[in-house]
Regions:
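Long, well-structured alpha-helical subdomains associated
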Residues: 193-250
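Substrate-binding clefts and substrate-entry loops adjacent to catalytic sites
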Residues: 127, 145, 163-173
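Short alpha-helix carrying the canonical HExxH Zn2+-binding catalytic motif
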Residues: 148-168
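Acidic helix-start/capping segments at beta-turn-to-alpha-helix junctions
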Residues: 83-98, 184-185, 200-216
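An active-site-proximal "capping" alpha-helix that borders the catalytic cofactor pocket
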Residues: 176-195
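A metal-dependent hydrolase signature that marks the N-terminal structural subdomain at the beginning
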Residues: 17-127, 141-144
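Short alpha-helical functional segments enriched in proximate histidine and acidic residues
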Residues: 78, 166, 190-193
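Intrinsically disordered, low-complexity repeat/linker tracts enriched for polar/charged residues
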Residues: 1, 6, 11, 16, ...
Length: 250
């Protein structure tokens, strides 16, 4: 038998126009209204005053302004908000960071705790000492400078992780998988796309190092299995994959 040749009718896919709420403000033609800005709030701290000057200090990456002020400037130049959203640096009583929102009236905030900044600092110091077999008193000014960059990159990652949660909520963005993973992906993307170093993967690698160190120091208990986050070592390997994808020579 001869099977007659079949002609598959050509399909025409209609052109789709996607309106993205977070494209550049200048020249934007989408319908998302820009009715607010991010702004900084530095709460007083009793137990972590050593970090007050650090969080308000000079930005060594941009070499101008302060780190958090530069982030606010970038965010307000590139993202639209339905209302003002504070980014709060505060003493919280726990090592944490979070995005919080409520309705009636609409309110959102991002909080980064001094306790988390302290934990990041301590973990990165421990990791550096382990990597180079150095005692604390043997660390040089050059060592401390490098550790400072590792801490700053990790705090930067935490900030954009929480911003990932904020944008998912404020823009009602559809996502697949765990929201915590998506927030990690957003943070990694921003650091890889906006970094000023020749090898931008170093930003994500420094942040990933914190999760690797955390997995080596902290013990896993039953609560970790019900946590909304993946295990710290899982987060490390995910970030390492993102960095490798941006630069296979990292």
């Amino acid at each position: 038998q001869t099977i007659p040749e079949q002609t598959i009718p050509e399909q025409t896919i209609p052109e789709q126009t996607i309106s993205v709420p977070f494209n550049q403000k200048s020249g934007s033609n989408n319908s998302f209204q820009d009715n607010g800005d991010f702004y900084l709030v530095f709460d007083e701290t009793e137990n972590y005053k050593v970090y007050e000057d650090w969080v308000k200090g000079w930005d060594p990456i941009e070499n101008q302004g302060t780190f958090f002020e530069n982030q606010i400037m970038y965010l307000n130049e590139n993202f639209k908000l339905p209302y003002d959203v504070p980014i709060i640096i505060a003493e919280c009583g726990e090592s944490n960071a979070w995005y919080y929102s409520e309705t009636n009236p609409s309110y959102s905030e991002i909080v980064i705790c001094y306790e988390l900044i302290d934990e990041i600092n301590q973990f990165q110091i421990w990791s550096y000492q382990e990597d180079y077999d150095l005692a604390y008193e043997e660390l040089t000014d050059e060592d401390w400078e490098y550790i400072g960059y590792q801490v700053l990159d990790t705090v930067d990652f935490v900030l954009y992780h929480e911003l990932g949660h904020a944008f998912i909520d404020l823009y009602n963005l559809p996502i697949t998988g765990l929201e915590e993973n998506v927030a990690d992906q957003f943070a990694a993307f921003i650091l890889l796309e906006t970094g000023v170093e020749e090898d931008v993967s170093i930003y994500v690698i420094n942040a990933a190092n914190f999760w690797l160190t955390s997995s080596e120091i902290l013990e896993i208990d039953e609560s970790n299995y019900s946590d909304v986050h993946g295990f710290d070592r899982q987060r490390f390997y995910n970030l390492a994959c993102y960095a490798y994808g941006s630069n296979s020579q990292f």
